[in-house]
Amino acid sequence: MSLKEKILDKVEDFLKTIIIKYWYIDLTITIFAFLILYLIEKFRKNKV
């Protein structure tokens, strides 16, 4: 596992935590976090 993949994993976990804890406070943060997660997922699929 490369350093970039480890960083992506950490970012993904962090964003999921944000979505779970703060979705009811501010919807724009949640939408932004979902967008980043989606982009990470696309990046991984293109790499494989």
Swiss-Prot record:
Query: Which superkingdom does the taxonomy of this entry point to?
Result: Viruses
Cellular compartments annotated:
Host membrane
Per the record, its GO cellular-component terms are:
host cell membrane; membrane
Membrane protein topology class: Single-pass membrane protein
Write the protein's name. Uncharacterized protein ORF48a
Annotated membrane-spanning segments are: 18-38
Which keywords accompany this UniProt record?
Host membrane, Membrane, Transmembrane, Transmembrane helix
